């Protein structure tokens, strides 16, 4: 109950307080990357229930002569890299928190296709709502492998408290200021494809 109250107050305050910044970023995304401004993708939530996660776009839709999208590294602009490094692309996820699909703190939502590849241990990370930030994010982010990431997520599930959430929120701000480990492809995972068994 306390966690949900915190989620509502924090996300509502965030969206209102950062509304001018969100508007500026949205305008810049529209000018530099085109439309749509938001990137929307289904992700697994609590008990694997799909929800539509929203983020700011960070890549263009440029295609090659064959009509196929260019490789991610060619579509990612310096502006997109900046959004990722500062985590500004993730600010709209607070809307998901306000709706109740996500929490401020919890395991980061991965791709839907990964759910069937989880071991029973790894699947335990879905016993709580996914978060905007989490225990794994302040303990390595994309610098750790899938096994360690999922182990940290399950550790959080077993040890979660309101005060641990507060610690994670505070430490996240320091991580964002340091711009640590945020490079990734749009809609993809910073660790590469998860194929099961920690791979």
Where are these regions (language model features)?
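A hydrophobic, helix-centered structural microdomain
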Residues: 1-61, 168-199
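An acidic site on a long C-lobe helix of protein kinase domains
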Residues: 1-4, 17, 75, 87-93, ...
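Residue-level recognition of specific faces of alpha-helices
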Residues: 27, 40, 55, 75-78, ...
